[in-house]
Regions:
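His/Met- and acidic-residue-enriched segments that coordinate or traffic transition-metal cofactors
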Residues: 19-57, 65-67, 96, 163-165, ...
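Residue-level signal for alpha-helical transmembrane segments in multi-pass membrane proteins
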Residues: 2-5, 239, 368
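Bacterial Sec-dependent N-terminal signal peptides
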Residues: 1-17
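Membrane-embedded glycan transfer/ligation machinery
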Residues: 63-66, 109, 164-167, 229-232, ...
């Protein structure tokens, strides 16, 4: 296994003597607060016009935004952002989305539980517990081979994005209630996905079983940037929300987190971004800020917790943060976000989406702790 601080130039972490030095004006807490506020405020202003906010306010696309917005509300201490979230959630009656088993449809519950932990209002929690208990009592035996023509195959976590959407619901419920049934279920399902989609030679996840054996133009395997961003972000959420003293489940997730972190650090582009295709960036040379945001979030969280050595990973995180900042327009719109999809696609600067902002705000909340006071 490579050591991150001995990476070759093409990995983009040591391509010249200045590449690792973030403009000092950006690497301080006030700057992090300012840019995060600008991004959050632009998104709130644009939210009513967003097609997914209109059609699926309880869906995963908005759900990933809510997670970042909650982190930002905590960081800023500004009740405006809590109020914005609470208003949306009250309108939804704190319900999860409709598909009983679908991981995407419980992503929002992670923020519901965080809100409950803050305000202790049981109405925030009841629908989530009802859904989780139903799934536990009626486990799906669908195949792990994703096939959209067979509904039972999306009842399991058969695509790697699901590892961000659902496990953090169950880790939170386990920590909140002390009931091990939630963690036994989540651990069993996560490991089924890991066994099916994780490539132990590459230390990366296939998006789903359809991509196993497929090749990019350069004859490398297809590993999607945002897909692996979802996983590293999801692992950070699992580690963050498991009980601190847990010794039964944590070791597996921590080992996987470290293994993937090392591989992802190696794959950062010279420009500081991770690209839509992790192993064929030449075919997809444009920045991709949803992958970059989730990966920066994961790595920064790892440094803050002492899981990843700062001397190796801080240069990677600084470079990634600088890249994210370059993608923000003066009005706060985050660009270069790959649209909804399942595999590498071309991205342009004008593309944005709710989960891209969510990833940016999650990253900002960890970067703030790393930045100079």
């Amino acid at each position: 296994t490579c050591l991150v601080n001995n990476l070759p130039a093409q990995a983009g972490t040591k391509n010249n003597t200045t590449s690792n030095i973030v403009a000092s004006s950006n690497w301080n807490r006030q700057s992090v607060m300012d840019i995060a506020r600008r991004v959050a405020d632009w998104q709130i202003k644009d939210y009513p016009e967003n097609k997914y906010a209109k059609s699926e306010p309880r869906g995963w696309i908005a759900g990933a935004l809510y997670m970042g917005m909650f982190d930002w509300a905590e960081l800023s201490g500004d009740n405006t952002y809590y109020d914005w979230l609470r208003k949306i959630f009250n309108r939804q009656n704190w319900q999860v989305a409709n598909r009983m088993y679908h991981a995407d449809d419980v992503c929002i519950a992670q923020t519901y539980i965080d809100f409950y932990n803050k305000e202790k209002n049981e109405n925030m929690l009841k629908p989530t517990i009802a859904r989780a208990d139903w799934v536990l009592n009626n486990p799906s035996n669908g195949s792990m081979d994703l096939d959209y023509s067979k509904g039972s195959t999306i009842e399991r976590w058969t695509w790697c994005d699901a590892l961000f959407m659902a496990p953090g619901v169950y880790t939170r419920l386990y920590t909140l209630t002390g009931n091990r049934k939630y963690m036994h279920f989540a651990d069993s399902e996560f490991r089924a996905t890991y066994n099916h989609l994780y490539d132990k030679d590459e230390d990366l996840f296939y998006r789903d079983s359809r991509y196993i054996g497929q090749k990019e133009a350069n004859d490398k395997k297809i590993f999607w940037g945002r897909g692996n961003g979802w996983v590293i972000g999801g692992l950070a959420e699992i580690l963050k929300t498991l009980p601190a003293d847990d010794k039964e489940f944590r070791p597996f997730y921590l080992d996987l987190f470290k293994e993937m972190s090392e591989r992802l650090a190696w794959l950062q582009g010279k420009d500081g971004y991770w690209h839509a295709s992790l192993l064929d960036p030449d075919s997809y040379p444009s920045p991709e800020t949803s992958a970059t945001g989730f990966i920066v979030y994961g790595l920064a969280y790892g440094i803050n917790q002492g899981y990843l050595p700062a001397n190796k990973y801080l240069p990677v995180v600084k470079k990634g943060w600088e890249a994210l900042i370059r993608a923000v327009e003066t009005d706060g719109k985050l660009g270069w976000v790959q649209p909804v999809g399942a595999d590498p696609k071309k991205v342009t600067r004008d593309m944005t989406e709710l989960y891209g902002t969510g990833a940016f705000l999650m990253a900002a909340s960890e970067i703030y702790q790393l930045a100079e006071k």
